Amino acid sequence: MSAELNQPVPRPGILDIAAYVPGKEHVDGVAKVYKLSSNETPLGPSPKAIEAFSAAASHLEIYPDGQAIALRQAIADVHGLNIANILCGNGSDELLGLLCHVYLGAGDEAIITEHGFLVYKIQIMGAGATPVTVKEKDCVVDVDAILAAVTPKTKMVFLANPGNPTGTYVPVAEIRRLQAGLPKHVVLVLDAAYAEYVRKNDYEAGLELVSGNRNVVMTRTFSKVYGLAALRVGWMYAPVDIIDALNRVRGPFNMSAPAIAAGAAAIRDQAFVQKAVAHNALWMEKLVTTFTGLGLTVTPSVANFILIHFPDQDGKRATDADEFLSRRGYILRAVRGYGFPNALRMTVGSEEANLGVIAALTEFMGQA
């Protein structure tokens, strides 16, 4: 007989989860900082989104639309989708959690990749299932490695495309091959948080695969190119059976009215989105060229961030660079937890921030 408990105890596995640690926002003793650690857009949200958000403030006593119809319809209109296949949530993180809650349990396995988004592992373990990590090949998802890891216990596969923190992507032909090789009951989750930034002819965010299959879902976010990270707005495109299952456990009012209004206005303002994408493309090229010229190695990125690898020598490692940059007010993201102990991830920021990092790293790399 087990000993009597004298306090509440979480179910097995919960205390084995390493809590997610966001990118830092402040540096002690530094008045002005440039936060380049969370992949936020330097252009901010669309003025139309701000206007819609402000207008919603006059009705805060009213519950929001539990179906988020205005937002779902806006997404459907912009992408040419059926509104019945769209589910919105309090950030795509909530939707990923719902998927795990509904489709995973004790004894199940879910496959993640070596450098994948840390939230996947947290949600999988939170559902009582076991995460199975597969190696990537040169910072790119290896489809053959994923297929080789499938067992009778596999119920879900998570794939960030583009990847975070690598910024690399998997061509649509490889995604199709992955889906075709998975058992039909295994859910393939395509996390396309950075899809709007990709300018590659062989990339497809997931709309096509979801439309033609019953076991594929795609998640997207308004936290990146749309500049609504503070409001927590995400959406999912999935088969109606999966949408129905998630709706059965989803909170009845899981999104605020201001978030719904701002999201709908933001996605309809595609002209503003293109400004953000153009700014990113311009500075991505400049930053990569400059950093490479300094002797740094950069992982090719199609997103809005750059993974910068530092020399393995005293005074020049990523930890040294992080401290050097932080003292000057430039906050990049340490990515040791993603398997890159000697790299930093930099968000493509404003012109002022980008030029500042260039100057700081030029000084850093030139030190004796």
Curated annotation (Swiss-Prot):
<comment type="pathway">
    <text>Amino-acid biosynthesis; L-histidine biosynthesis; L-histidine from 5-phospho-alpha-D-ribose 1-diphosphate: step 7/9.</text>
</comment>
<keyword id="KW-0368">Histidine biosynthesis</keyword>
<dbReference type="InterPro" id="IPR015422">
    <property type="entry name" value="PyrdxlP-dep_Trfase_small"/>
</dbReference>
<keyword id="KW-0032">Aminotransferase</keyword>
<protein>
    <recommendedName>
        <fullName>Histidinol-phosphate aminotransferase</fullName>
        <ecNumber>2.6.1.9</ecNumber>
    </recommendedName>
</protein>
<dbReference type="InterPro" id="IPR004839">
    <property type="entry name" value="Aminotransferase_I/II_large"/>
</dbReference>
<keyword id="KW-0663">Pyridoxal phosphate</keyword>
<dbReference type="GO" id="GO:0030170">
    <property type="term" value="F:pyridoxal phosphate binding"/>
</dbReference>
<dbReference type="InterPro" id="IPR050106">
    <property type="entry name" value="HistidinolP_aminotransfase"/>
</dbReference>
<keyword id="KW-0028">Amino-acid biosynthesis</keyword>
<keyword id="KW-0808">Transferase</keyword>
<feature type="modified residue" description="N6-(pyridoxal phosphate)lysine">
    <location>
        <position position="224"/>
    </location>
</feature>
<comment type="subunit">
    <text>Homodimer.</text>
</comment>
<dbReference type="GO" id="GO:0000105">
    <property type="term" value="P:L-histidine biosynthetic process"/>
</dbReference>
<dbReference type="GO" id="GO:0004400">
    <property type="term" value="F:histidinol-phosphate transaminase activity"/>
</dbReference>
<dbReference type="InterPro" id="IPR015421">
    <property type="entry name" value="PyrdxlP-dep_Trfase_major"/>
</dbReference>
<dbReference type="InterPro" id="IPR005861">
    <property type="entry name" value="HisP_aminotrans"/>
</dbReference>
<comment type="similarity">
    <text>Belongs to the class-II pyridoxal-phosphate-dependent aminotransferase family. Histidinol-phosphate aminotransferase subfamily.</text>
</comment>
<dbReference type="Pfam" id="PF00155">
    <property type="entry name" value="Aminotran_1_2"/>
</dbReference>
<dbReference type="InterPro" id="IPR015424">
    <property type="entry name" value="PyrdxlP-dep_Trfase"/>
</dbReference>
